[in-house]
Amino acid sequence: KQRAIRANKSGADICIRLHADAASANVRGVSVLYPSQQNHYVAKLSKKSKKLSKNILDSYCKSTRFKKRGLSKRDDLTGTNWSKIPVALIEMGFMTNQNDDLKMADSSFQQTMAEGIANGVDAYFQ
C-alpha cells in the first residue's frame, strides 16, 4: 500500500512494480499482472494498465528471450488496488528456475532486462 501511495504522490504517469516469481524448478518465464475492470477501486485504470502490461511483456520477452507466460488480471494486490495511475507488476523470471535465476543475477543481463522494460514503456507512450 505504501509503495502505491508513494507512486501516486510522485507525479509519475505510470507505476512499474518489479518482482521475481517462484514455483517448481521447471517453471520459467515472464508474466505481467494488472488490475481488472471488476475491481471498483481501480476499474478506470484497467484498460491503460493492460496496455502498459502488454507493451512491457512483449518488449521484455523480445529483449531477454524469456518464455512469455502472458498477462494476468489480479484484484488482490494492495500495490495495484491503491494505485491512481496505470500500474503493471512484472514477474521478470523465476528465481526457482536455474536458467532464469542465473540470467537475472548477471549484471550484463540485467541491462538487457532494463532495456526490455524501457522499450515497453516507450511503446506505451507512443
Residue ranges and their predicted role:
Residues 1-52, 111:
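Catalytic-core regions of hydrolytic enzymes
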Residues 41, 54-55, 63, 123-126:
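Charged, low-complexity C-terminal accessory regions
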Residues 37-38, 61, 76:
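A broad detector of the eukaryotic-type serine/threonine protein kinase catalytic domain
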Residues 47-73:
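Active-site-adjacent substrate-binding region
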Residues 3-7, 56, 117, 121:
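Generic hydrophobic alpha-helical segments
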Residues 17, 21-24, 33, 68-126:
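Active-site-adjacent mobile loop/cap segments within catalytic or ligand-binding domains
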Residues 5-8, 61, 105:
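Alpha-helix boundary recognition
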